[in-house]
Amino acid sequence: MFGLDAFMLARIQFAFTVSFHIIFPAITIGLATYLAVLEGLWLKTRNPDYQKLYHFWSKIFAVNFGMGVVSGLVMAYQFGTNWSGFSDFAGSITGPLLTYEVLTAFFLEAGFLGVMLFGWRRVGEKLHFFATSMVALGTIISTFWILASNSWMQTPQGYEIVDGRVVPTDWFAIVFNPSFPYRLAHMSVAAFVSSALFVGASAAWHLLRGNQSTAVKTMFSMSLGILVFLAPLQAVIGDVHGLNTLEHQPAKIAAIEGHWDNSDGKPTPLILFGMPNMEQERTDYALEIPVLGSLILRHSLTEPIPALKDFPKEERPNSPIVFWSFRIMVGLGLLMIFQSFYSMWLRKKNTLYNSRWFLKFSLFMGPSGLIAILAGWFTTEVGRQPWVVYGVQKTRDAVSAHGDLQMSISLLCFLVVYSLVFGFGYYYMIHQIKKGPDAIEHDEHDEHDMTTVSGRI
């Protein structure tokens, strides 16, 4: 297919499925916590707007959760079908970690999800709030175990190799590996930020159409209030995560920075834009700021960072991909910080809900959190190549022995099925968002009437 061998097709297929999948858990994590906050505020204040927003977003959450489960199962199966070498080599560590995720997180979510979605007016208010909170907690626990597994693949420790397979020797070291705390914090906050932007864009759409209801205004205000706190925090977390990556994966940082050579002994500049050239081993058309790279990554005005030429050619990541994916992520992050701070200025002027250009900007920023997450994951995953377990197992050694034709057909099937199934899911979510929170009362009235009629029948 397009002149690609089975190895590259397997990588493309996994990249496609995992990119599809990560969108849903990111929104699920943020919306679950948002729903718990909304229900808690409603119990405390009895403000009907919080109740409207809870019912409005719970429908979207349910669809999102379902698509996340389905896409996650498909992705997990690929470890056995396309990456059997990895499963055979590292399954004694990644297998238990994924099992812990199912036992501690998925069972918790599944157990309380039914009460959360269908228990309104059927169980007590406090019990329902407890169920919502447990679902939110389950999403966080799920994030914990998934990122523990991924982080171990990035910075492996607590193991030994026996007969060509990884054997765990210290589970605490495996779970709390060097990059895990930074990766967990970075991804969790990214999920909250993405959800806040998604919610804010939905509110902006209704405000632009003249819907000035208090529920819509509350939705817009809450999303921007969360963004004011989390967007700058994410920048700080990203900075310390970068320092950790420099310590444990210096080749990745060199590729991100497009930095090739330290032979001149000068401090490393920060290349804002350019075109990394893997063949010529340089970054063409570089627009750079002298010394700033060393200052950011070394906190020094003289000490350079490692260069790509310090590593063998076969162990260098694809610099053009990670160079640009990182800059997309950072650029969107800066726009998020601008959006949050400017919202404070508009709030002070009492024009937050009336500034049409800002409402349009907020609508435009709706998918930016998810795009930034995808760019970030491209950076971290492509940046660790050619390793699947960093420094231990190469990606080419992890792939299953499939033919080119098999992988081509498999990839085409995934493209078609995902486009159809998840296309309908996206359509339903957009349809629900367009209805708005004020339509919930009418829907609930219809549901109550149908329940009464069915009960009489």
Over which residues does each language-model region extend?
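Polytopic transmembrane helical bundles with strong interfacial aromatic enrichment
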Residues: 1-457
